Structure formats: structure tokens, C-alpha cells
Amino acid sequence: MTDEPGVAAAERRGFRQRASGFALDITPLRRNPAFRRLWFGQGISFIGTEIAEVALAYQVYQLTGSTLAVGLISLTHLVPLLTLTVVGGAIADAFDRRRVMLVQQFGMVAGSLGLAGNAALSHPRVWPLYVFQFVISAAFSIGVGAQRSMTPQLVDESHFMAASALNSVTSQFGAVGGPGIAGLLIKFVDLKWVYLGDSLSYMGAIAAVALLPRLVAREDADRPSWSSIVAGFRYVRSQPVILGFFLVDTNAMIFGMPSALFPAMATHRFGDPSLVGYLYMAPAAGALLVSLLSGPLRHVRRQGLGVVITASLWGVAIAAFGFAQELWLALVLLALAGLGDQISAILRSVMLYRITPKEMLGRVSGIEFMQVAAAPSLGNLEAGALASATSLRFSIASGGVACVAGCLLLAAAFPALLRYGAQANAEA
């Protein structure tokens, strides 16, 4: 006679084991107190930043009534991004990365306090909003190379995949939850308190980073200079795998980034301008889902091929989104696009950590972030221009098709990317 309770218990254990295989691997948080402190500190800081950016856009529009004035905020991000990120990467490779990130966070505190002070005035001015946001963006750009190159110094190589997924959770959670929290705060509290809360979030990051060990790439590293910055670009050009996945992602973002068209899609395709928030949220929701269920990614061996496939998935989903007539289908397709993009991002991070020597990682991470942040802006420009000349459907659908075609061409041009695997350093 079968022991039914024993069979049932075994089935439950088997189900739990299968389910745990999909769950986010939190081993780096459990085993590495330094990484845990950095992760929590960055998470708090990121959510505060997302909230403050929504509040800033709201305040600029309230003071000016101009969408152009709101759009000009992007220049306070783009200019430091294109000019200071690679400089900051060279600084991160020359000095203690912990100290570089502390300077970054203190600079962001100063900018946030400036925004709070302006908001506390009886008649807030517009120009300080741009000045203080530029200060925040400049500080962030200088420190982002150090920030993104800390993980491989704090985590064992066998846990790079898990650490990359954990890092993506904080950014995607902020992207999904930050705007909603900002909306509630704007409704119920004065803006100065929102900005003060942002400054406190940076203080949380400062407290976490201050407790980290000293993190230097090399004790005898050269001082940052123009030649050291150029060396970073030369290194990227000399590495076909890194250059290949940089170009694959750039291709996907330039041809397949339709977010500038979301307001028009909500208004003209779905008949309700208020639905635009759901369109913006859907890709982030798909990306967050991937991060939370990223366990199977540790079994991916041919990570370069994975980047090409998931970038192509983004393109296919975006092309289909261009034809979607129902809101639910549009949201599913955008979430699927976000899912593909996030898998690609995690795989790219792991490859970057494994290939790049630590004395070059700050510069390469800075170049990568510049590419990741700038390419979507170019993509939105392309999508908007093409839509104005043709139609929403053609702009979005053709962009998705061009993304897939570009991925296939780049895969053929960079066979080393397709061959890249990490069998020797496979996840445990």
C-alpha cells in the first residue's frame, strides 16, 4: 500500500525545489555583508531619485505651464552624462571607488537640498530647478563608473549573475514604484518635503558606502588623464564581445524605443490620455518580473547568444505593439519587451564583469552607462521624427523590424559574441 502522506510530502518538496529554481538568488546578500549594505543603500537612493525626478517635472510644469520647459530638464541629465561619465570612470580606476561614490552622494545631497530650499520659498524660481538638477546629474555622472564597478570587487565571480539580478531589482522597483509614490506625496505634502526626503535617501546610501572596505583597482594606478580615458575606449574597441553587445543594445534602443510615442498612442489608439502611465509602467513591470524570477539565468552558458536572442525579442514585441488595438495586448507586449531587455541587461553585466580587468572596469562601466542612457534618447528622437512623417503604427512596427534585422547583422559581424560562453566560470 502506498504511503500517501509520504508521497504528498515528497511532491510538495519537489514543487518547492522547482519553484526555488525560478526565484531570485539572494546568496550575495546572505553571504556578503558589504554587498548587502551597498545594495540596500543604493536601493533607497534610487527610489528617492525617481520620486524627486517626478516632483521636479511636476514643479517645472506648475511654474511655467510649458511642456518645453519640462523637456529641457533632460538637458541637465544628458550634458553631464555625455561629458562627465567617462571622466568619472577614469577617476574610479585611479582612486578608492568607495570615496568616489561618497563624493557622488554628497554632491547629490547638495543638489537635492538646493531644490528643497527653492521649494520652501514663497515664490519658487524656475532657473534654480535646472541648476540644482544639473548639480545632481553631474555628481551622479562622476560617480556612476565607481558605483557600477564595485559589485565584482565585493562578490565572488560565481555569484556575478545573482548580484546583477539583485542590482536590477532595485532599479526596476524604483522605476515601477517611484512614480506612484511621487504622485501620492505630491498630492498630500509640500514639495520641499519631497526633496528633503530625496536628500535623506542619499544619506542612507552614504551610510552604507562609508562602511564598505577600501576598493581600489590597483595601488599603482595612473592618475586620471585624457590618455587614460582614451585607453578605455580603445579597450572596448579591442574586445569584440564587449563591442558586440554594446552595439546590439544600441541598435535595439535606437530602432526599437517607442516611449516618446506613448502619449499619442494612449490618446489616439486607446482613446484615453490618462492611460499613458500604464504604457510607461508595462516594460518596467516585465523587467522587474524577470529580476524576481531570474534563477534560471544562472544556467545560461552562451550568454552572448542570449543577448542577441533577447534583444531580438524586444524588437519582435515592439513591432507587434505597433499593431495592437487592445490595451491589454499592448501592455502584455510591452511587458514582454521589458522582459527581453532585462534578461539582456543582466547577461551583459555578467559578461562585462568577467571580461574586463578590474583596473579598467571603472572606465568601461562609465562608457557602458553612457551608451545605455544615451541610446534611448536617440531612439525616442528617431521614433518621434518618423511618426510625424508617416504614422504611429509604421514608426513603431518598422522600428521593431529594424531592431531584429540589426541584431542579425551584428550577430554575423561579431561571431565571437555568439560563441561567448562561461563554462569555465559557470554559476554554481
Residue ranges: model-predicted function:
Residues 1-428:
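Alpha-helical transmembrane-bundle signature of multi-pass membrane transport and export proteins
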